[in-house]
Amino acid sequence: MNMKRKFAALAAALSLSACAGAQTGAAQPPTNVHSVTSRYGFDETVSRLKNAVEAKGMTVFALIDHRAAAQKAGLDMQPATVIVFGAPKAGTPLMVKDPDFALRLPLKVLVTETDGQVRAVVADTRALIADSGISVADVENTLDRVPALIEKTVGE
């Protein structure tokens, strides 16, 4: 077999392999986020999560309405609001232990609606602390409780 045919066969095999991998990967749920299907509408979900965070003594630093920003730019997108929140008493010791961890705080929860389904999405705690100087033990009574709070507040 000449070089051109070998190269063509190799390219075809790699293409098929990549396609098979992409299909397999698409079927796997992302492991770096925790997603909760809300039993409420979009606005109610945002409101309930904001109130739940504040009721737990955390501060809501910002609400980022991505859809409004898109519309202001002449674009359209699905409803998507990010609630930026945290508790300095919990976050400060983590940032003292690992100053670069400040890039991952404050926490964020995305509320989005696609095809009539409202979801609240937050970074998985293990993914959040991966490649940092923070251990699971450092966050088990703080950051690690956020997915349960979201589930309790809006979960089906």
Regions found by a protein language model. Give the residues of each.
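Bacterial N-terminal signal peptides that target proteins for export
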Residues: M1-A9
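Bacterial N-terminal signal peptides
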Residues: A9-A18
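Terminal, regulation- and interaction-focused segments at domain boundaries
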Residues: A20-G57, K152
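Soluble non-cytosolic domains of exported or imported proteins
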Residues: V36-E44, F61, A137-D144
